[in-house]
C-alpha cells in the first residue's frame, strides 16, 4: 500500500506539467527514505530538468539509500538534458519503482536495465494504467507515429451545430466555453479548417483569464503556452489579415500547393498531397507525428469533423450538448458522404458524462 500511496503522489505531481511539457511526456517523481518524502518534483517544460532531477535536488544527501517513485522509466540517453539514470545512480538511490516503461525507442527498457546493472532494485508496472492515461498523446505518437486526436463538437439536443444561415454563436453556454479553454490548454496543437477561419475568424488561443480557478492555480499566467494552430487550407483561402495568424505562438498551414504571399515568421507551411480530390488527412497526421506533435484538439465544422471520423483518425469525441432545439433546417453535426450501412458507422463508447453549467458534456472514446 505504501508503494501505491507514493506513486499516486508522483502521478499527481506529473499532472502539473500537462500544460507545458510538449513534446515531452508528463512525469512526476517522489523520493522516500524511512517512510518520509525527502524530495519530489515534476517535469515542467521540454529542455528543462526532468522530474527525477528536481526531486534529487530537493532530497540532497537524503537520496542515498532511498526509494524513487517515478511515473515513467528514467531516461538513459543524452537529449536536451543528461540521463536521469546517471543522476539516480550518482545519488546512491537504493530502489526505483517506475510506473511504466518508456516507449521512446531511445529508452525502451534501457533505463531500467542500466539501473539494475548499477545494483539498484528496480520494478515497474505499478499504477500503469493511470500513468498511460496521463500521457495518451506521447504514447500514441511513440507507438504508432500518429498524434492523439480529440474532436470537439458543440450541438443542440437534436444534433445541430448552426442555423441554416451559419449562425452558431453561441449554442453552448459560457461554462462550456471555459471548459473548452482548459482542454485547449492541455493540447499540443489545435486543428481547424479554412472554412471555419473564413466563417468565424477565430483566434483559437488559450485565454488565461477564461480558465477556471483550479486550472489557473496550477498554471500561472507567466507560463502560458499557446498550442500550435494548424489550418487545413487546400486552396490558400486564408489571408495574413485573419486573426488566427496574428496571435501569439505558431500557425501552421497544411496546403496542397505553395503560397507566395508574405507571412509572419511564426507561420509555417506543410505541403500535403491530395487523395481523392482532398488533402490527405492520413498523410497530414503522419507528418504532424514526425514534427513531434503529441495531441491535437480539433475545432472545425461538419465537413472536417466527418472526414476525420470516416478516416478513423479520431481517438476521442468531446461533445457539448445544449438544452435547445434548432430544427431540421439547421446544420448537422458532421458530414459523412457515402455512409450507407450501419456497420460502416464510426463506433464509440461513453467514457464520461458530466454537467457543465446548463449543458451536458459527453466524453467518448473509440470502441
Positions of PLM-derived features:
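Residue-level signal for inorganic ion chemistry
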Residues: 10, 28, 75, 115, ...
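Active-site ligand-binding patch in enzyme domains
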Residues: 140, 150-157, 161-294, 303-306
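Zn2+-dependent cytidine deaminase-like catalytic core
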Residues: 31-130, 309
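Flexible, gly/pro- and Lys/Arg-enriched active-site loops
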Residues: 310-348
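Short gly/pro/ser/thr-enriched loop/turn and capping motifs at secondary-structure boundaries
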Residues: 103-106, 129-130, 198, 237-239, ...
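Short, basic/aromatic recognition patches
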Residues: 2-22, 141
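Conserved histidine-centered catalytic loops in small-molecule metabolism enzymes
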Residues: 337-367
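Short beta-strand scaffold segments in enzyme catalytic cores
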Residues: 27-35, 153-154, 362
Amino acid at each position: 500500500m505504501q508503494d501505491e500511496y507514493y506513486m499516486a503522489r508522483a502521478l499527481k505531481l506529473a499532472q502539473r506539467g500537462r500544460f507545458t511539457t510538449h513534446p515531452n511526456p508528463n512525469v512526476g517523481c517522489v523520493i522516500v527514505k524511512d517512510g518520509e518524502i525527502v524530495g519530489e518534483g515534476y517535469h515542467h517544460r521540454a529542455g528543462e530538468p526532468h522530474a527525477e532531477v528536481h526531486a534529487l535536488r530537493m532530497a540532497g544527501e537524503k537520496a542515498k539509500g532511498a526509494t524513487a517513485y517515478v511515473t515513467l522509466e528514467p531516461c538513459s540517453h543524452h537529449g536536451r538534458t543528461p540521463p536521469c539514470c546517471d543522476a539516480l545512480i550518482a545519488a546512491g538511490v537504493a530502489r526505483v519503482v517506475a510506473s511504466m516503461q518508456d516507449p521512446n525507442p531511445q529508452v525502451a527498457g534501457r533505463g531500467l536495465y542500466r539501473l539494475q546493472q548499477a545494483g539498484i532494485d528496480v520494478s515497474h508496472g505499478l499504477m500503469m494504467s493511470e500513468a498511460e492515461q496521463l500521457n495518451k498523446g506521447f504514447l500514441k505518437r511513440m507507438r504508432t507515429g500518429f498524434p492523439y486526436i480529440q474532436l470537439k463538437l458543440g450541438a443542440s439536443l437534436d444534433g445541430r451545430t448552426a442555423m441554416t444561415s451559419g449562425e452558431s454563436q453561441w449554442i453552448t453556454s459560457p461554462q462550456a466555453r471555459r471548459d473548452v479553454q482548459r482542454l485547449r490548454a492541455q493540447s499540443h496543437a489545435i486543428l481547424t479548417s479554412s472554412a471555419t477561419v473564413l466563417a468565424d475568424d477565430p483566434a483559437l488561443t488559450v485565454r488565461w483569464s477564461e480558465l477556471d480557478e483550479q486550472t489557473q492555480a496550477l498554471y500561472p499566467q507567466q507560463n502560458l503556452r499557446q498550442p500550435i494552430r494548424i489550418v487545413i487550407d487546400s486552396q490558400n483561402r486564408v489571408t495574413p489579415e485573419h486573426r488566427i495568424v496574428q496571435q501569439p505562438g505558431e500557425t501552421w498551414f497544411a496546403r496542397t500547393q505553395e503560397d507566395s504571399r508574405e507571412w509572419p515568421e511564426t507561420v509555417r507551411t506543410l505541403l500535403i498531397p491530395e487523395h481523392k480530390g482532398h488533402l490527405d488527412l492520413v498523410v497530414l497526421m503522419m507528418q504532424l507525428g514526425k514534427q513531434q506533435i503529441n495531441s491535437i484538439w480539433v475545432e472545425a465544422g461538419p465537413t472536417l469533423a466527418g472526414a476525420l471520423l470516416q478516416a478513423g483518425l479520431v481517438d476521442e469525441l468531446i461533445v457539448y450538448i445544449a438544452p435547445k432545439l434548432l430544427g431540421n433546417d439547421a446544420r448537422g453535426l458532421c458530414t459523412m458522404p457515402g455512409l450507407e450501412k450501419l456497420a460502416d458507422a464510426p463506433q464509440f463508447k461513453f467514457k464520461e458524462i458530466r454537467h457543465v453549467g446548463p449543458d451536458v458534456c459527453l466524453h467518448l472514446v473509440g470502441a
